């Protein structure tokens, strides 16, 4: 009996030590994130600029609110506020999210989930401020203008001259469906949910090869919805897997399973992994 008690005590101590070590890693990681975020904020020379990458000379490369990654930096700041509850991050998050108001009715991109949905969902969840809720809903309405009932998918890029063909859809679009599911929950309007599901279903049908890798781009005929081409895009070739695209599909279909409970989506996520 004493042996069992000693063994149990030893296991408890080891588990406690492991938990403490993990917590120390988390604290260290967030401390570094705070330093890096404060530095990035100080390098932005205007309130409506967002960090993009770095120039060869070591200076920061920035983008405007219309850049597809504009929502990432504000979202990171909201996450810092959630972890630390330090109001300096709350103030910065509000300030860096404010320029995204300009995207409220912007219909020229499929990336509104990245740009608006990501930071505004966090902002609304953490503050309860209806301004962020409405901004997310308005951006969702803008995204729906890019949906074709004939094709059954949200168009990615527009063509020069307004030519309807090819109707191009990229695997990245799966990431933007999360905003539509959120809008459906916030409004009770099933339209957002149904369009997200239809887009996911057609992506499931046409975007994957037999080896479970995904095409970056699938082209459709806007008038018939027929597939006219499947391309590698940012991958090495039309026949290769593109790692970032695989991750878009992996996250996107996992999220769709969470939102719908449809096991087909979970199966696709597992196969993508």
Map each language-model feature to its residues.
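Bacterial Sec-dependent N-terminal signal peptides
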Residues: 1-24
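Glycan-recognition and catalytic cores of secretory/periplasmic carbohydrate-active enzymes
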Residues: 22-273
